[in-house]
Amino acid sequence: MAFNPPVIRAFSSPAFTYVFKFPYPSWKEKEWLLHALLAHGTEQAMIQLRNCVPHPDEDIIRDDLLLSLEDRHFGAILCKAVYMATTTFMSQKQRNMFPRCDIIVQSELGETNLHCHIIVGGEGLSKRNAKTSCPQLYGLILGELIQRCKTLLATRPFEPEEAEIYHALKRAEREAWGGVTSGNLQILQYRDRRGDLHAQQVDALRFFKNYLLPKNRCITSYSRPDVCTSPENWFVLAEKTYCHTLVNGLPLPEHYRKHYHATLDNEVLPGPQTMAFGGRGPWEHLPEVGDQRLAASSVSTTYKPNKKEKLMLNLLDKCSELNLLVYEDLVANCPELLLMLEGQPGGARLIEQVLGMHHINVCSNFTALSYLFHLYPGTTLSSDNKALQLLLIQGYNPLMVGHALCCVLNKQFGKQNTVCFYGPASTGKTNMAKAIVQGIRLYGCVNHLNKGFVFNDCRQRLVVWWEECLMHQDWVEPAKCILGGTECRIDVKHRDSVLLTQTPVIISTNHDIYAVVGGNSVSHVHAAPLKERVIQLNFMKQLPQTFGEITPEEIAALLQWCFNEYECTLTGFKTKWSLDKIPNSFPLGVLCPTHSQDFILHENGYCTDCGGYLAHSADDSVYTDRASDTSKEAIDAGDLGDTDGEDSESEASEVGVRPSKKRRITIPATPPNSPGSSVSTSAFFDNWCAQPRDEDELREYERQASRLQKKRESRERREETPMATSSQESESEPNPTQWGDKLGVIPSGTPDQPPIVLHCFEDLRPSDEDEGEYIGKERL
């Protein structure tokens, strides 16, 4: 005989009711897939149950099937998963592994949705957080369902249609942790006089007795309630059905359901007409209470907030629900509530306190990266992304930079807690930094003008923006702590010093931040420790005026792609990009042979390895005749970076050799018999591992690059004419007279005279006497 759970006689308060909808709309047409995913092994029993006769006819096979499927069908598995997720949800709310709460879960097959009713009560839930906790509970339920689907994956791979349901659950789970439920988890609410919706507390036992219990059983949409429910357990007036019920983790059998309903109706929840006192006075046998005890018991312990406190609580809920961070957001989204609070005594101060509390809540629950994804969920990276374009123009791998930004903003990059964009004006450094901090929104700025309180605006922020950073002796020590992510205390105006926790820092400047200015002296003592805390990106190429601003959505798309593809930790970054140590000067990108950093070639997308734009496919209308006739063997491996299909040799003969652009210098492999060339090439790459910092270094860079280019061209010309060289070597060597002519040794006219040796600035000119001999004659 099945175990009958005891009747629940008290329910923890406050209690709320939720409805979870299975995030797969076409579940009824593919119900057999749910049998395989959630209740593997029950498919045949469900098919046999479809052909059984209804009650009250006798059917032994039907009774055996219902008994074997008591808690093994997919509705029971769904009910158990929801119960386990709700238990985890309450343990997180109470911060206890064994929460003290009451939970009732009932799964039902609706006309359109497969859903579960949840009644939960206990400490940790309140009118303020029950509604905002819906995404958290939704994500936990989907996680439990995914784990149960993986039990089938351990035995065999998914079928294509099963994989479709599995990926739908995974996609819904990612959206849930981003705060999106898509209406699949709802809480019972009421509307106040202003039209706002709030979570509605319920009388759990009455709700369970009047709404959930009086229903008939139906465990599959292929069958009917009169097949799954016996006549003695049939609710006559019930129109809706249920699938499975759990009361505090214990299943409620079908044959015990009417008795449970009668016990709740008669004993636990009696009406006013059933209260009787046996013919005696109601106060006759009560114990006597002393004056002091009566006075103590008559005092109400329930605290009732006043109007000001209610307004503050409502404003705090609005800030959390609508992501309101500054006073301007409050004016734009809830002006009525703001005016009501401004009308209270000290209203402006109260609003600052509410915003401060909301900032503390955001900083404790989010990092800069997670809050950016919370504000911009579902962004996709496209090839026309301006952040991608800017980093390619400046010579960096945008995916590598995005990976580093994810690690820094997620506080997972060790001691290097700062990203510095350095370069001259109009290079995009402020454009990039502004897009990052404005996407996060909760940021603080460093103010050099307020010399006593430089970091006054940096507390309770997700990120710090230091625009035009200048290092001074007065604040270099706290700056080293902040740039390195070390907790320190900072001075705040009109208050005591406050603790500043680890906060990522974004710097955009054209100053040398490693040189500390103090009085009339400049010190470089702090340069080494500052460089260990900063990742510097050198932006040296000026942008056109029509480049435009980078939007926060584009930054969010780049970082979201990197966060999904890479492991955003210090170890993951070093492993992915094969680095032993993260240098102060961020490494330049290395493009794949056929990929480009020019935005003109962005239509084919971007490379997921180097970040460059993919080359265009071959097109006869673009390529010239000569280029189209060129065979694969005639293409030089060093020229694979040029994919525009034009004859590069003819252009070089017309225009001449010019220095190549930054990071696009093509240096061929060094011949084995040329050790000098390999030394110069390796020295060139060692000297220019980072971009030039000023115009002098840029000129030196172009000079050395031009020299290497000329060496490569001369070596190619020598390789192209090997036969001419061999023919010259085969000729006979010159005789001494010929060597003398070449060296400038001229024999004299008389045998006794020594030969005439000509120096580099002399030639053999005839004397004046000799000139007279040739007058009127033709010189031989």
Curated annotation (Swiss-Prot):
Residues 397-552 form the SF3 helicase domain. Pfam families: HBoV_NS1-like_N (PF22419), Parvo_NS1 (PF01057). The active site is at residue 211. Residues 11-271 form the PV NS1-Nuc domain. It is found in: Host nucleus. ATP binds at residues 423-430. Residues 723-738 have a biased composition (Polar residues). Keywords: ATP-binding, Coiled coil, Covalent protein-DNA linkage, DNA replication, DNA-binding, Endonuclease, Helicase, Host nucleus, Hydrolase, Magnesium, Metal-binding, Multifunctional enzyme, Nuclease, Nucleotide-binding, Transcription, Transcription regulation, Viral DNA replication. Its EC number is 3.1.21.-, 3.6.4.12. Transmembrane segments: none annotated. Residues 627-681, 696-780 are annotated as: Disordered. Residues 700-721 have a biased composition (Basic and acidic residues). Signal peptide: none annotated. One of its GO terms (cellular component) is host cell nucleus. It is an enzyme of class 3 (hydrolase). Residues 193-197 are annotated as: Ori-binding. The endonuclease active site can probably bind other divalent cations. A motif (RCR-2) lies at residues 115-117. Belongs to the parvoviruses initiator protein NS1 family. This is Initiator protein NS1. It comes from Human bocavirus 3 (HBoV3). The lineage of its organism: Viruses, Monodnaviria, Shotokuvirae, Cossaviricota, Quintoviricetes.
